Regions:
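Generic preference for flexible, low-structure residues
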Residues: 27, 145-146, 180-181
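Metzincin-family zinc-dependent endopeptidase catalytic domain
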Residues: 1-6, 36-161, 166-176
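Short, intrinsically disordered, charge-balanced linker/junction segments flanking boundaries
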Residues: 174-186
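Disordered inhibitory propeptide/activation segment of secreted metzincin zinc metalloprotease zymogens
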Residues: 1-33, 83
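Ser/Thr-centered flexible coil motifs
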Residues: 31-38, 183-186
């Protein structure tokens, strides 16, 4: 933070990932973000900038913290995506995982291939960027460990009706974000 109360983040769309990097994350099958994914990631970042004192600039490094985006096709059982907080946690910083976010792209999970406004791929981008901003899930659960369900929620309002960081549908709290057959998410 530069004393102005605004966090200036930089980001990069990865063009490659070493085998060591992939092993560190427990994933396989790197691929670059498509132009569609890049555009939707920028819009998801703008969603955060609209409600928080944070800016995002695409460049190789710099800013208060740095984020990266990449795709993977295997590993991280149960996770459609995952991300790490940039630069503030020694565990992540020394391991080289800080600020990284990864999105599952394969034949059995296609939501991240064509993210767009009002679909789960776009919601996933917004959610994972939230993790890089330091936000956690409203409850103690994680798709990478076990098979969490709404029964694991710590409080009744732990749904996407109240937080983009929740795993659980707004239907669990008698809300409905479906308009004309389309889910209206971040």
């Amino acid at each position: 933070v530069d004393g102005n109360g605004i966090i200036d983040l930089t980001y990069t769309f990865l063009t490659s990932a070493s085998q060591a990097t992939m092993n560190k994350h427990g994933i396989t099958g790197f691929s670059q973000f498509s132009n569609l994914q890049k555009g939707q990631a920028v819009l998801a970042m703008q969603s955060w900038a609209d409600v928080a004192k944070v800016t995002f600039t695409e460049k190789a490094s710099g800013g208060d913290f740095h984020m990266t985006f990449g795709n993977y096709s295997g590993g991280q059982d149960g996770a459609a995506a995952f991300a790490y907080l940039p630069g503030t946690n020694d565990k992540y910083h020394t391991s080289g995982t800080d600020g990284t976010s990864w999105y599952l792209i394969n034949n059995s999970y296609t939501a991240n291939i064509n993210p767009g406004l009002n679909n789960y791929g776009r919601q996933t981008l917004t959610h994972e960027i939230g993790h890089t901003l330091g936000l956690d899930h409203p409850g103690d659960y994680n798709a990478g460990t076990g098979n969490p369900s709404y029964r694991d929620a710590d409080y009744g309002q732990d749904t996407r009706g109240y937080s983009v960081m929740s795993y659980w549908s707004e239907f669990n709290t008698n809300q409905n974000f479906t308009k004309g057959g389309v889910e209206a998410y971040a």
